[in-house]
Amino acid sequence: MEKILVLLLVALAVVYAVPDPRGIIIHLEDGELCLNSVQCKSKCCHRATGLSLARCAPKASENSECSAKTLYGVYYKCPCERGLTCEGDKSIVGSITNTNFGVCHDAGRSKK
């Protein structure tokens, strides 16, 4: 009887030790507060203005405004979805000030 009780307690401990798929620090859903894009499932931590709180947001779709890269891990415009490219101005000053914005285009479709 004791062995069954111990086995049951071990099984319960294992079940409760399994981590929740929803993250507290990483794997954040869209709309949750973030500090860096690495934390978000979408890989885009977005802020509307320099003074606003950053939140996870979906990546930019075709013909939407986008940012190619960020040095800081937080975007004013999210990068494009997979398969799209962000076409626009790219400068060193824009990289530093986080103002290199463009528009998402399908590279395969625009070449045709």
From Swiss-Prot:
Disulfide bonds join C34-C45, C40-C56, C44-C78, C66-C86, C80-C104. It holds the Pfam family Colipase. One of its GO terms (biological process) is response to food. GO terms for molecular function: enzyme activator activity; lipase binding. It is found in: Secreted. The keyword Transcription does not apply. Residues 18-22 form a propeptide. Expressed by the pancreas. Colipase is a cofactor of pancreatic lipase. It allows the lipase to anchor itself to the lipid-water interface. Without colipase the enzyme is washed off by bile salts, which have an inhibitory effect on the lipase. Enterostatin has a biological activity as a satiety signal. Belongs to the colipase family. This is Colipase. It comes from Canis lupus familiaris.
